[in-house]
């Protein structure tokens, strides 16, 4: 009888699907954190797959690492996030200076959304801009994402647009799976779009006065996954008070993907955000604008190393390309947790 109970228990545990969120950075050089690395895929336990900031470190829609994508997120319209360029090939060029080719006029985000029938979830002006790119690729209008009871259900029949105002949210689920909530939150940055992605007429108007076109407000995201993980994706940003009041106090985030990027955030400021404002259980460091690693280990004398030395009381992992980490509902890394 005891053996029968054990067998039943084992069978039951084997039938329960994994309850971890899988996080996979897609960079330019396998196993490294390099200067142009931006893209990250988040896979909910339900199977819903979200691509965040495709940028320039993917090879466009044909990148074999992408797999199924249900939702495309873009934090702001800078070329390294919306994707005015794309990676020529995995490992092309150096980690500091990868070899890129143009992704104009479509952008990597537009290409991928069109090819994967993905929902564009972002602030309205940028969602509409990318919806037009998808329309050009598909040769038909990009519809609004269908909803029932304020919930979008993937997979979608075609790429669709789901614009969100700052502070608003979209709820998405895969089939009959549990829902994932995606909230658009502030960032302290700008959101100017590369002229290469604009029409010739628009470029001429802007070039005459050397001005830029901004596609709405720059943002970050808070994603509440079905296992309880609450992830804060900062986007490009400086420090601001809502990191504590909104992200920590209200959303109670327990995981943070932090963009370092010295034009917006230096190591001491970034460490203060982590240690004193947001206080997540775990940090994933990305967008470092330097070849930060060699053999997957952080190089001394880098801004990345400076930041790591200042963070206290929680693990920081590097967004090493192709290395999947798994996070439980509390924000703890439980698999693929390589030390920097």
Task: Show where each model-derived region lies.
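Active-site beta-strand termini and strand-to-loop segments that position acidic
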Residues: 42-45, 174-176, 223-227
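N-terminal signal peptide c-region/cleavage motif recognized by signal peptidases
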Residues: 11-13
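Binuclear metal-ion centers of metallo-dependent hydrolases, dominated by the metallo-beta-lactamase
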Residues: 111-176, 271-340
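Active-site environment of divalent metal-dependent phosphoester hydrolases
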Residues: 31-36, 58-59, 78-83, 122, ...
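Active-site neighborhood of phospho(di)ester-bond hydrolases with catalytic His/Asp-centered motifs
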Residues: 51-55, 69-85, 121-124, 232-237, ...
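Boundary of Sec targeting at the N-terminus
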Residues: 18-19
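Pre-active-site segment of Zn-dependent metallo-hydrolases
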Residues: 28-111, 191-212, 237-251
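Metallo-beta-lactamase
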Residues: 209-268
């Amino acid at each position: 009888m005891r053996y029968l109970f054990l067998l039943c228990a084992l069978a039951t545990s084997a039938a329960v699907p994994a309850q971890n969120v899988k996080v996979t950075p897609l960079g330019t050089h396998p196993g490294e954190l390099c200067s142009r690395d931006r893209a990250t895929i988040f896979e909910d336990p339900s199977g819903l797959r979200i691509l965040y900031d495709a940028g320039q470190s993917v090879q466009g829609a044909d990148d074999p690492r992408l797999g199924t994508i249900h939702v495309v997120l873009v934090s702001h319209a800078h070329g390294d996030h919306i994707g005015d360029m794309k990676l020529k090939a995995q490992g092309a060029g150096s980690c500091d200076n990868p070899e890129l080719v143009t992704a104009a006029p479509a952008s990597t985000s537009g290409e991928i959304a069109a090819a994967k029938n993905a929902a564009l979830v972002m602030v309205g002006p940028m969602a509409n801009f990318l919806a037009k790119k998808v329309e050009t690729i598909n040769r038909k209008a990009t519809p609004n994402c269908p909803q029932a009871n304020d919930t979008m259900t993937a997979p979608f029949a075609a790429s669709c647009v789901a614009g969100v105002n700052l502070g608003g949210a979209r709820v998405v689920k895969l089939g009959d799976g549990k829902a994932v909530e995606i909230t658009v939150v502030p960032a302290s940055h700008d959101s100017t779009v590369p002229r290469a992605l604009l029409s010739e007429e628009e470029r001429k108007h802007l070039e005459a006065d050397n001005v830029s076109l901004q596609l709405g407000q720059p943002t970050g995201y808070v994603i509440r996954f079905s296992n309880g993980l609450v992830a804060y994706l900062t986007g490009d940003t400086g420090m601001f008070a809502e990191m504590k009041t909104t992200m920590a106090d209200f959303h109670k985030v327990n995981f943070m993907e932090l963009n370092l990027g010295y034009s917006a955030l230096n190591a001491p400021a970034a460490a203060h955000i982590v240690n004193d404002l947001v206080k997540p259980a775990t940090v994933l460091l990305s967008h470092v604008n330097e070849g930060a690693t060699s053999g997957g280990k952080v190089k001394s004398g880098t801004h990345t190393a400076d930041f790591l030395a200042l963070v206290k009381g929680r693990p920081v992992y590097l967004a090493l390309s192709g290395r999947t980490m798994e996070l439980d509902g509390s924000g703890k890394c439980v698999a693929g947790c390589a030390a920097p």
